[in-house]
Amino acid sequence: MMRLQKEAKDAGGRFFVLNGNHELQAAIGDLRYFSEDDVMKFSELPGDTRSAKVRGAFVRGGPYANWIANNPVMVRVGRDLFVHAGLESWVEYFLIDEINAMVKSWFLYFQGNGPQPLLSTGWIIGQVGPMWTRLLSEGRISEEQISSMLKTKGVARVIVGHTVTASRLPE
């Protein structure tokens, strides 16, 4: 994906990579969702064990730390809002840049690249935040709330990628 971002930029375009729960888990050293194949991709990195090699890739000085920390969790393109997992009513109170900045501050902290963010912003990386919440995709937000969120952000639709559908097809 890093290569695709560079190629898109070189061609005058853009390629967005959104941070989600797996990037957050990598930043805090939670490797539960790394397959053996994923771990093997890090075999050339320094470290005594495979898990140390993977963890080292995502902390200060690691090859992916800055890249991940600088990827957004939410991006608006035209009238579309892309977000990893979903939205809740909190989205109405923050600008997209503010949301991305809060998430970035937590990534930097977990990587050892920044101070501890205010604990009052911890919700942004928790179950109700844009990397985890499934309320929108599970239909647990009213149409009125959705309309209000869309209007506040000036978008026509929200596109999420976190939740797998039963048919594995877009719904």
Regions found by a protein language model. Give the residues of each.
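Feature recognizes metal-dependent phosphohydrolase scaffolds
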Residues: M1-E171
